[in-house]
Design a protein with these regions (language model features):
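A short, solvent-exposed beta-strand micro-motif common in secreted/extracellular proteins
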Residues: 602-613
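Membrane-embedded alpha-helical bundles of multi-pass integral membrane proteins
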Residues: 20, 30-38, 42-61, 72-90, ...
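Hydrophobic membrane-insertion alpha-helices, especially the h-region
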Residues: 497-515
Length: 649
């Protein structure tokens, strides 16, 4: 037996793509390779986004944008069978969108496809924008979860100079005069960010030829049916309205959108900013952190190019354009876009394209081998049957195999040809183009003069040396004929099981979308002092000349007095808290926001607000009873300190 000759150029490639296919083949057996959800992660993500948008438009028809009536309108919607079903579809499609984006991101990392910088960065941005869409959407319900969202968001931004911490207190107090503006911003952001996402998706696939925007039609049906089932079986419910209590003690928590907010429970605000910015930067620069040498680009001999346009049409990454060169139309390759897949070699009947990693094929007459094996660079080292005389070539992608070369091999030096391919092509289209060429559906066609049944394609998860041996021993019909290529792949799925498994997967995500999380301890006594205060002026700025008749009657305030907030125990008058607040503005001449949030062990406290420059001007409220759970709010109303109720009065 002649030893197998392996022609391999370049370095070994990542094992991540191989591992992912071995994991995903379970779903191929049920769905088929074409409909495998793991091979359509991006398409399913776009589909879920489209479903969320369509259902969101419908839900918006019945939504009252006034925050005082928002919860009631959502509740009325939920109490209607069809409207409630549409709301559930909107909610679950949004949650699943995050899940599939994350799986898509992990798949990209695992298979080292993040080197395409534009696609990677736009993907990261789209994930962040989707999170913003979800958070603003939850705000619009204006239930206890919305109140908690507003409070945590305001608390996070309070560390920035242009935001004040008192906004967090306004959310807790349900002060719609203050937070009503933020409510409108949330509504505006929810709509605008959705439109921005469409642009980001376009950028994401900008440099990809023939992108799969949506999954195959049957898979679309499976997703919609599964989504409909869980929306009917598990209708979405709101938390109690925001006005129901001051502190959102116990709220449902959607981990898919709120995972970042949980860090507010564990770390300080500044630490959360470091985590937020740091993780965003690290994700964005992963293509630079993890070095992976790309395949060299292909080379086109313009003297041989006959301008057939097939290479430009077949390139998965739009790296080839047909341009005028010295008055003649030629194929011009952009090396910055080329990933070195060499699929263009399989497109060129004129052998005008070469690649450093493509082997030198023996097509001339010689003693025939039993099987000639082509394996793609992402196919693991195959175990070959020792009893066969095998000629083996390793190519960058099976899409680089030219039908004309296979014809010459079958004619001159081999009995049969086996092609070992990825189940899901690393370069997207290589496997598809190869099959279609040998099925005579895509140029360059495999000639009808040759029997295509002498060629077999086996995917990574289908290959075994026993199958290769059986293929080599298969007899060919003596009647002749063009035959058809043998394809070892998962071609047929089970629609019923496909829908059931997808429904089960969708249902398993529901618990994480509505777990109960507490950011406030119901056993603690929380005191919150929150109000706007304009202190007395300490300096004035006089405009005009020194003449009395030139002076203005109401001079401008140049500076105002700071104030000091003190909190004492009503029992023993022990000082619990003291803080000085400065008026805002560059000249300290603008109103200030008084805000503090304390957990106090006392049963009652006294609150005293004193103007530093005018000690006689003082506001005092004694013997404020503190209660567990819902908290106690002290506000300034009608020029006196009072304890607010749940409605902010």
């Amino acid at each position: 037996m002649e030893n197998s000759r392996i022609v391999q150029k370049g370095k070994d490639l990542t094992k991540g793509h191989q591992w992912f296919q071995k994991f995903s083949t379970f779903f191929s057996r049920i769905y088929s390779t074409e409909l495998n959800p793991m091979y359509n992660l991006g398409g399913i993500s776009v589909l879920l986004f489209a479903i969320a948008c369509i259902s969101g438009i419908y839900v918006f028809i019945f939504y009252n944008i006034n925050p005082r009536h928002a919860w009631d309108s959502v509740e009325a919607m939920s109490n209607n069978v069809f409207n409630g079903w549409m709301r559930s579809i909107h909610r679950y499609s949004s949650d699943l969108l995050v899940i599939f984006i994350l799986i898509h991101l992990l798949h990209t990392l695992l298979t080292s496809k993040f080197k395409r910088l534009v696609s990677w960065v736009s993907g990261i941005i789209s994930f962040l924008v989707v999170i913003l869409i979800g958070v603003t959407g939850y705000m619009l319900v204006w239930d206890q979860k919305a109140k908690l969202t507003g409070y945590l968001t305001a608390k996070l931004f309070s560390s920035l100079p242009i935001f004040d911490a008192s906004i967090a207190g306004a959310f807790l107090l349900n002060d719609l005069d203050v937070v009503g503006g933020f409510f409108k911003v949330a509504l505006f952001g929810h709509i605008v960010f959705s439109l921005v996402t469409i642009i980001i998706i376009w950028v994401h696939v900008l440099r990809i030829s023939k992108p799969k925007i949506f999954p195959p039609k049957k898979l679309v049906y499976y997703v919609i049916i599964a989504l409909d089932i869980i929306a009917i079986a598990f209708p979405v419910k709101s938390d109690p309205p925001a006005q129901a209590s001051n502190l959102p003690i116990s709220t449902t928590f959607d981990w898919y959108y709120y995972f970042g907010y949980y860090l507010m429970k564990l770390f300080s605000v500044n630490t959360n900013w470091l985590i937020l910015i740091g993780s965003g930067v690290v994700l964005s620069i992963i293509p630079y952190l993890i070095k992976r040498k790309n395949n060299p680009p292909a080379f086109i001999d313009l003297d041989k190019c006959n301008a057939c346009n097939l290479c430009a049409y077949d390139c998965p990454y739009e790296a080839i354009d047909m341009l005028q060169v010295e008055g003649k139309r030629k194929a011009i390759l952009d090396p910055d876009k080329c990933v070195g897949c060499a699929i263009c070699i399989g497109s060129c009947d004129e052998h005008a394209i070469t690649h450093p990693m493509f082997p030198d094929l023996v097509v001339m007459p010689k003693p025939k081998s039993d099987v000639t094996v082509f394996s793609c660079s992402y196919f693991p080292e195959p175990e070959l049957p020792s009893e066969l005389n095998i000629q083996r070539y390793r190519v960058p992608c099976t899409g680089s195999i030219m039908p004309k070369d296979v014809q010459r091999m079958l004619e001159n030096n081999t009995e049969k040809v086996a092609i070992l391919s990825c189940e899901d092509c690393y370069y997207r289209l290589g496997k598809t183009w190869t099959i279609n060429r040998f099925l005579r559906k895509r140029a360059p066609l495999f000639s009808k003069k040759f029997d295509a049944s002498l060629v077999q394609l086996l995917t990574l998860t289908q290959y075994s040396k026993e199958k290769l041996l059986a293929f080599s021993k298969e007899t060919v019909s003596e009647e002749g004929g063009s035959g058809e290529i043998n394809i070892g792949d998962h071609k047929k799925g089970n629609p019923v099981w496909s829908v059931l498994i997808m429904t089960l997967f969708f249902a398993l995500m529901i618990p994480l979308s509505s777990t109960t999380v507490r950011f406030f301890n119901p056993a603690e006594k929380t005191l919150i002092v929150n109000f706007k205060y304009i202190s007395s002026p300490t300096e004035y700025e006089q405009f005009g000349s020194g003449a009395a008749h030139m002076q203005v009657k109401n001079p401008a305030v140049k500076r105002r007095s700071p104030v000091t907030l003190k909190i004492f125990s009503s029992k023993d008058k022990k000082l619990i808290f003291e803080k000085e607040y400065e008026p805002r503005g560059l000249r300290h001449d603008i109103a200030m926001f008084i805000f503090t949030q304390l957990v106090v062990d006392e049963d009652a406290v006294d609150v005293v607000l004193t103007e530093t420059a005018f000690p006689d001007k003082q506001y005092k409220l004694d013997n404020i009873k503190l209660k567990q759970g819902d908290g106690t709010f002290v506000i300034l109303r009608d020029d006196k300190l009072i304890v607010a109720d749940k409605q902010g009065f």
